[in-house]
């Protein structure tokens, strides 16, 4: 139980996949203009990350390793992620058509979000991970992504109404804000040693 809590805290705060490992920067910068869109994408991405972590672990342990096909790991994980995203897209379309329309092109683009493939590959590289720990790591990575995305969207909404100098408007102030946010998360660096 303690190990699972440490994995959660590590993936959410200490080794955040967006701010520390720089995975998932495209949706981080692209979808973070409105908090509603950021919440919707973060929920969908967390769902996909959790399912992809589970499925990729099962594919790795019960298909690729026994058949000595580990060199096909990246291709097989991309297929698993594509299927997971299609499933998520169908679920979101059925449960919340408004959210489906708001997310638009960003929902299918979760397939190409490098955080999803990165978590699957990092889980596969950790030999000590079990099915439960891989699933918890995927879920925690999604929570960490969600936390950062929603916080960044809230800051960008406030910056949009602030008096920002013309040379810093747009992407420049976004990058500065992301950098300061990354520095803030560096404060968690000594919290956990795995």
Curated annotation (Swiss-Prot):
<feature type="transmembrane region" description="Helical">
    <location>
        <begin position="131"/>
        <end position="151"/>
    </location>
</feature>
<dbReference type="InterPro" id="IPR003667">
    <property type="entry name" value="NqrDE/RnfAE"/>
</dbReference>
<feature type="transmembrane region" description="Helical">
    <location>
        <begin position="172"/>
        <end position="192"/>
    </location>
</feature>
<keyword id="KW-1133">Transmembrane helix</keyword>
<feature type="transmembrane region" description="Helical">
    <location>
        <begin position="71"/>
        <end position="91"/>
    </location>
</feature>
<comment type="function">
    <text>Part of a membrane-bound complex that couples electron transfer with translocation of ions across the membrane.</text>
</comment>
<keyword id="KW-0249">Electron transport</keyword>
<feature type="transmembrane region" description="Helical">
    <location>
        <begin position="39"/>
        <end position="59"/>
    </location>
</feature>
<keyword id="KW-1003">Cell membrane</keyword>
<protein>
    <recommendedName>
        <fullName>Ion-translocating oxidoreductase complex subunit A</fullName>
        <ecNumber>7.-.-.-</ecNumber>
    </recommendedName>
</protein>
<dbReference type="InterPro" id="IPR050133">
    <property type="entry name" value="NqrDE/RnfAE_oxidrdctase"/>
</dbReference>
<dbReference type="GO" id="GO:0022900">
    <property type="term" value="P:electron transport chain"/>
</dbReference>
<dbReference type="InterPro" id="IPR011293">
    <property type="entry name" value="Ion_transpt_RnfA/RsxA"/>
</dbReference>
<keyword id="KW-0812">Transmembrane</keyword>
<dbReference type="GO" id="GO:0005886">
    <property type="term" value="C:plasma membrane"/>
</dbReference>
<feature type="transmembrane region" description="Helical">
    <location>
        <begin position="4"/>
        <end position="24"/>
    </location>
</feature>
<dbReference type="Pfam" id="PF02508">
    <property type="entry name" value="Rnf-Nqr"/>
</dbReference>
<keyword id="KW-0813">Transport</keyword>
<keyword id="KW-1278">Translocase</keyword>
<comment type="similarity">
    <text>Belongs to the NqrDE/RnfAE family.</text>
</comment>
<keyword id="KW-0472">Membrane</keyword>
<keyword id="KW-0997">Cell inner membrane</keyword>
<feature type="transmembrane region" description="Helical">
    <location>
        <begin position="102"/>
        <end position="122"/>
    </location>
</feature>
<comment type="subunit">
    <text>The complex is composed of six subunits: RnfA, RnfB, RnfC, RnfD, RnfE and RnfG.</text>
</comment>
């Amino acid at each position: 139980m303690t190990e699972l809590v440490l994995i959660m805290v590590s993936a959410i705060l200490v080794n955040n996949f967006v701010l520390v490992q720089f995975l998932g920067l495209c949706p981080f910068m692209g979808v973070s203009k409105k908090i509603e869109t950021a919440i919707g994408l973060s929920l969908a991405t967390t769902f996909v990350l959790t399912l992809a972590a589970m499925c990729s672990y099962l594919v790795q342990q019960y298909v690729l390793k026994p058949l000595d096909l580990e060199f096909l790991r990246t291709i097989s994980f991309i297929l698993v992620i594509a299927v997971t995203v299609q499933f998520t897209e169908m679920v979101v379309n059925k449960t919340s058509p408004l959210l489906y329309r708001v997310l638009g092109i960003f929902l299918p683009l979760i397939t190409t979000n490098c955080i999803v493939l990165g978590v699957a590959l990092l889980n596969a590289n950790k030999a000590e991970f079990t099915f439960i720990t891989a699933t918890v790591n995927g879920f925690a990575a999604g929570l960490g992504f969600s936390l950062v995305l929603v916080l960044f969207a809230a800051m960008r909404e406030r910056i949009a109404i602030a008096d920002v100098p013309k040379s810093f408007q747009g992407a420049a102030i976004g990058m500065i804000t992301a950098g300061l946010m990354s520095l803030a998360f560096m404060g968690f660096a000594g919290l956990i040693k795995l």
